[in-house]
Amino acid sequence: VKRVVVLLVAVLAMAAPVVGEAAQTPAIMPLAEVRPGMRGIGKTVVFGQRVDEFRFEVLDILQSGGGPIGSDKLILFRMFGPLAERTGGTAAGMSGSPMYINGRLIGALSAAFAWQAGQRDIALATPIQDMLKVLDRPSRPTSALPTYHASRPHVIGGRVVDRVVVTADPFRALGLLAGLPANTAVATPAVVTFTRGLSPRANRILANLLEPKGHEILQGHGGRGDFAARPLEPGSSVGIQEVRGDVEFGGICTVTTKIGNRVLVCGHPWENLGDVDYALTASEVVTVVRALPRPFKVGNLGQIIGVIDQDRGTAIAGTLGRLPRLFNVRVVVTDQDTGSRTELGAQVVRRRDLARAFTPLIALSAIERARNQAGGEGTAIVKLTLRAKGLPAPIVRENMFYSTQDVATASVLDIVDALELAFYNDLRALEPYDLTVETVLMKRRMTASIVDA
């Protein structure tokens, strides 16, 4: 049984770009001019869509790094002031928060340390000069376990350290910390990822699949809001979304800068897949939860305002006013024993790996919601209808499944084959539009046995 997952994106509305807006690069301060002891302000959203300011002091410039953040130098800084006291320091979702010294942009908050008791005030920033390269060309590949070196020791989380390891996997962070020398700290990207609408079992499968990529999944946090999207500015909260509708998967980051209709966000990669086609959405922040081991933003994602087209090591880049390509998934489940009908609809980013991963989980969630249970004996009659550009007519496939233990999982097996045909077809290039999954469930066993031949 292949365990797979689904990401969603639905087109609600698209904010039009401002007519005649100048594509002007902000005033920047090169990293060579940034010195320890310099102070400045950063911008982020901690409630609604209002951009607030925090204060920071540069502690050091870390050298010779790499890894998930594709820069060989990072800025070590201390966050302070009323906003820092309110949030408990840095929080997941603040990635991309622009940081200025004397009105000049130096970079974006990108990573926080794995464990700081009390106030999480020490963090890392990606230099803006490395981020701007993402608008023009890919970042170079980096090593698996980078180590940045400080010019002098610093106290972080009660430890005196002069080396920092950056890992994309928050699940590994504390384990790495325990096995590293006492003078080495561990930091992870400050991003929050949430899912909504999946069944508990489907969500566990998704978490297991995404754990190697460093996504720490928060189930049930976030959602869609009907709020009006405000014009973006440095410090605005935005959403990155791969699945949208009755099932959702995405995250919240912060805008570092906006140049014409192009935006830079996060200061680190999402999945580091290079050329991509994710949805860029409006976002509002409900609150910042001060939790251990790290605080995180809880927010809502709104209308689609553009597309994320670059997912690189130093930043994520997007274009306002363009729509991502979407693959529609509709699942209808009828329980013949109870007469109940359950329907889920979602839009998935039209990437073959994402559609193949997420679509079966949408179907699994619908079946488990219809039966109000995970697993169990039963028969499923499944009808798949696939539409795609390049096909003379829709492809329809009907099949029957029976299981003594888990009819829900058995019933989604054909979905994988349908997606293989749609996205991995060697004979003809197809552009899949949608897949409809109609499932009829019953407890009655409808099988036969050959008794003689």
What name fits each language-model region?
Residues 5-16:
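Bacterial N-terminal signal peptides
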Residues 17-453:
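Terminal presequence/propeptide segments associated with secretion/organelle targeting
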